[in-house]
Amino acid sequence: MNWRCMVSIKVAFVALTLGMAAGAQHPAAPRDNHSAEFRAMEQKLAYLKLNAAKAHPDPKPTELTEAEANAYFAEGGVKLPKGVSQIHLASRPGVLDAHAKIDFEEIMQGRGSNNPMYAMFSGKHDVEVVAQASGAGGTGSIQVQSIQLDGSEVPRWALEFFVQHYITPKYPNVGMTTTFKLPLRIESAAVETGRVRLVQR
């Protein structure tokens, strides 16, 4: 997976918790007239890449803020998979709260249309994901706590069914609990209020 997507999605998070952003293989084409927050995020990602290339990376923490991450998504910093849009992230200690517009027709592409469970995950919905998130020892972990569709919480059994049948087959490393190797020699990722602190080693 492209390093920009790994940092901005797997460390910051909505779509990964749904299993969607794992398909974002490449950053979107650059555009002019970006916000200061977008440019700050871009500079920090470039720094992380350069620091990772050093024999001994500077362990000084790099902070990615909510405003920077949200601007990066909103202004096309990451080419999202079909069916995922309008990502907005918020955080508090150890927890990520992510909102997105999800078009399940685009995601499922007709699969499972004869299954009664399909009705719950059809059409376009406003989705909110709350997940515990952390990173230590070079490994990141995201554990989904709850998901709401249009303000109504999805029963856990229904969510597990959807993930098992429509997400994991396409993205084998994604589930209700997802662990992954942090990119760019990131040793730890601490989710705090309004920011994520990354340490490289």
Regions found by a protein language model. Name each.
Residues 8-21:
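Bacterial N-terminal signal peptides
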Residues 1-7:
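N-terminal secretory signal peptides that target proteins for export/translocation
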Residues 23-201:
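Extracellular/lumenal and peripheral-membrane lipid-interaction modules
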